[in-house]
């Protein structure tokens, strides 16, 4: 399992199955009640000196604010099956007449994830002026190796008056990732227009329709706005038979959450043998116990604010900057061992500077219902929107021991 593995990347079984994973729990998660940085300009486009795609920011806003209608007809049903949205900004592109060649670094795509949708988004005026275009897709890692992934032809209708053209590359990417096959096909991809507000139009591109100048030009990311050419991948992490460690903890410290089956068996054997010895030392008393008035402690939900900047995660988490994760509190003699039932919430809690009394939890006073949370962050030069399970305590209660 990756962090946010987003990132979101944006999976849980609950009565809200009909709702997209990235939208589940939104009834209780609101910018006012959960997100602590409500004063932050959520429309900011700068992060660590880099501009992040306007599309990713809009998608994040739509998710946390429940704007289903703002999603396209293709993206809305896809989000119901996805928990991660990953964006890849083009490293460079070349044009020769009406032939466009795009280069992306897709090294961070996990083959263990199930690809749901791949969209190529091109927001260049020169591309809109072309009528018949051939597009070649390449994977490149640090510009050293260029691997051809597939190609397609499309006719752009002049009636499609929009800022961006969006192409469905799901089949192309699935064929390459699962079978290693290159896909070359004519007209299998339909162009559709998608209007993006606040699209930067500062960059100027030469008209590639001037065939007389067949000289090849190469443009790099620095020459145009970040979202001008971008590949957006919607995916879902594959389910496993064994329960996975917290996605946040596994992302940062994978070795810490490694599981040694042999060690578990040995520890289990020692624990069983110790319990047997303890049982043999128990003596039955003939004196009846005195009646004790039973006082049930209160198990309640209290605030637990998480500031990602303070725990050292501010350099890669874009939104939210902070949030209220809550925790369960009750008087208890025996604290809970948080390693027994590790969750994203317990991992976050272990990083906070809580007092000993705040850190202790009763084994019987535990979260009864937890919510997931979508996060937008920067990883491996890619911007990722990922949905993480068990991030916020919604209800506390006593469990049977």
From Swiss-Prot:
Tissue expr: Expressed in the epithelial layer of the Spemann organizer during gastrulation.
Cystine pairs: 299-365, 328-396
Alphabetical keyword list: Cleavage on pair of basic residues, Developmental protein, Disulfide bond, Gastrulation, Glycoprotein, Growth factor, Secreted, Signal
Residues in the signal sequence: 1-18
Residues carrying sugar: 168, 337, 341, 344
Positions of the pro-segment in this chain: 19-274
GO CC terms: extracellular space
Coiled coil segments of this chain: none
Molecular function GO labels: cytokine activity; growth factor activity
Annotated localization: Secreted
Taxonomy, superkingdom: Eukaryota
Gene induction: By Li(+), siamois and wnt signaling, including wnt8 and lef1. Induction by wnt8 is inhibited by vegt. Not induced by vegt or activin.
Subunit structure, as described in the record: Monomer. The propeptide region interacts with bmp4 in a non-covalent manner.
Function field: Exhibits mesoderm-dorsalizing activity and neural-inducing activity, but lacks mesoderm-inducing activity. Regulates the expression of specific mesodermal and neural genes. Induces convergent extension movements at the embryonic midline by activating the fgf signaling pathway to induce t/bra expression in the organizer region. Acts with wnt11 to induce Spemann organizer cells and induce axis formation. The unprocessed protein antagonizes bmp-signaling.
Swiss-Prot/TrEMBL domain comment: The propeptide region is both necessary and sufficient for bmp-inhibitory activity. The propeptide region and the N- and C-terminal thirds of the mature protein are necessary for neural induction activity. Although cleavage doesn't appear essential for activity, residues surrounding the cleavage site are necessary for activity.
Protein name per Swiss-Prot or TrEMBL: Nodal homolog 3-A
Organism: Xenopus laevis
Gene it is expressed from: nodal3-a
């Amino acid at each position: 399992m990756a962090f946010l593995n987003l990132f979101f990347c944006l999976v849980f079984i609950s009565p809200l199955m009909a709702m997209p994973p990235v939208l589940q729990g939104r009834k209780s998660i609101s910018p006012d009640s959960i997100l602590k940085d409500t004063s932050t300009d959520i429309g900011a486009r700068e992060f660590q000196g880099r501009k992040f795609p306007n599309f990713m920011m809009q998608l994040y806003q739509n998710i946390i604010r429940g704007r289903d209608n703002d999603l396209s007809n293709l993206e809305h049903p896809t989000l119901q099956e996805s928990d991660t949205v990953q964006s890849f900004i083009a490293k460079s592109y070349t044009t020769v007449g009406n032939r466009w060649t795009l280069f992306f670094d897709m090294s961070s795509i996990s083959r263990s994830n199930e690809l749901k949708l791949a969209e190529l988004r091109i927001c260049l005026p020169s591309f809109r002026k072309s009528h018949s275009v051939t597009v070649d897709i390449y994977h490149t890692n640090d510009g050293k190796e260029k691997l051809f992934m597939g190609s397609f032809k499309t006719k752009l209708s002049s009636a499609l008056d929009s800022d961006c053209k969006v192409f469905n590359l799901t089949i192309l990417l699935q064929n390459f990732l699962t079978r290693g096959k290159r896909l070359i096909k004519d007209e299998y991809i339909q162009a559709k227009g998608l209007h993006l507000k606040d699209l930067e139009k500062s960059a100027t591109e030469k008209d590639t329709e001037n065939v007389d100048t067949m000289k090849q030009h190469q443009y790099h990311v620095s020459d145009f706005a970040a979202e001008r050419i971008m590949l957006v991948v919607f995916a879902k992490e594959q389910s496993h038979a064994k329960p996975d460690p917290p996605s946040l903890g596994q992302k940062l410290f994978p070795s810490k959450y490694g599981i040694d089956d042999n060690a578990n068996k040995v520890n289990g054997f020692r624990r069983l043998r110790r319990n047997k010895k303890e049982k043999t030392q128990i003596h039955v008393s003939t004196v009846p116990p005195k009646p004790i008035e039973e006082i049930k402690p209160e198990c309640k939900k209290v605030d637990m604010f998480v500031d990602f900047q303070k725990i050292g995660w501010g350099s890669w988490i874009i939104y939210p900057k902070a949030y209220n994760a809550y925790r369960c509190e009750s008087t208890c003699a025996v604290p809970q061992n948080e390693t027994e039932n590790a969750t994203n919430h317990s991992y976050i809690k272990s990083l906070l500077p809580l007092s000993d009394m705040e850190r202790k939890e009763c084994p019987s006073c535990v979260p009864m219902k937890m919510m997931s949370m979508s996060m937008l962050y920067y990883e491996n030069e890619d911007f990722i929107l990922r949905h993480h399970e068990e991030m916020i305590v919604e209800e506390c209660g006593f469990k049977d021991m």
